[in-house]
Amino acid sequence: MLEGSWINRREDKLGVYSLVHFSPKMLGSVATTLPLSSSNSSGMPLGYYLSSPQISRVTISTTGQLTSKATVGSCSRVENSLDASPFSVPKKQDESPMIGDGEDYFLSLFGDSKKLTAHSNYTQKTLKYFSMILEEVGQFTSSSLGDVEIAEVNVKGLFVKLINSSLDKEMAIGDHILQQNVNGQTISLYRFLPNIVMQANSTVTVWAAASEAKHQPPSDFLWKEQDKFRASPDCITILCKPNGQAIAWYTPIHWKQAWEKLDADVEFNRCSVVSPTFRKRVFQWTASTATITKEKQDQPKKDISNYQVEQAQVLLKREKEIPPTVFPNRSPWCQNPYVSAHPYCPLIEPHNTSTAGGRLDRQPRTRSTRPNRASGSKKKKTSESQKQ
């Protein structure tokens, strides 16, 4: 198998010269040297030599005039001599490994074997789980209000089986009605004989005519008029009292419901998968929480009580600020609200009943009672002027 490669490519205006060197492990000591011409296109293709089972080491070199451009690539092993021109093919006569065979070739085509194994295991688990669900296709969903239950409706429609789940009680099913409904419509109806009693932990089977069973009451009843019972998923089998009250009912599970259940379970499993990094973070968070909780538990009760007292004191020191109250402006000398108040007068006057009563009793003084000094002086001035 080839382990590494080293390519030296030289370009000039006239042509391209390349040096290819593969340096794998040596499988044998015997080597065969073959001459190689400078023109590879006219001779045997290079792929022929590479695909030969005898080749384990290939050295190809062409020499030419070096010009301006040169590109050198190196791998695990770099050799100093670049002027070697022979084409050497070491071979081993005992072993002849085929390139393209074995596990490596298989993995190159189909991927890692571990991944394939994991995928196959997941597929097997899914198929196994689905087979378990398919086994339950013949099962049912049954409900009852008492001890008498509908245990089974045969898939082929041959019988319907009732069971008394009580361990110490006898149940009377005389004149009870066993019916089957599809979309709310009754398609078949069977009435039990009167005075039929089911013993504790016993079964009663109603057989269809196609079963060719024998009529052996009180455990086996043959319904000759009914060829087969209906066992489809859309059919509900009901056991009713003589007055029509349902006391037990039975519904089979369809394979489509089983498939839907499988899809739901697979989707739930995908959603519930937790990545390893997330689990690690969860575990770290849990560990840190446990450490903090332990440290808190180790603290003495006195510190906790002191902390509570200090916290209460801090709460007591805080005072709630009362927002300022804005009173409406009004004049203290009149009742007109549009007159602004005097700046040196308080906005709120104390209420005094005596003064309030005196103000109400007081009457306003008329203008006639007031002496008019200005008018008197004018009269005197007019009389003096007349005398003169």
Curated annotation (Swiss-Prot):
SUPFAM superfamilies from the UniProt entry: Lamin A/C globular tail domain
Domain of life: Eukaryota
Pfam families per UniProt: LTD (PF00932)
Basic residues composition bias: residue spans: 365-381
Listed GO CC annotations: cytoplasm; intermediate filament; nuclear envelope
GO process annotations (BP): cell population proliferation
UniProt region (Disordered), positions on chain: 349-388
Keyword Metal-binding: no
Stated family: Belongs to the intermediate filament family.
Name of the protein described by the UniProt record: Lamin tail domain-containing protein 1
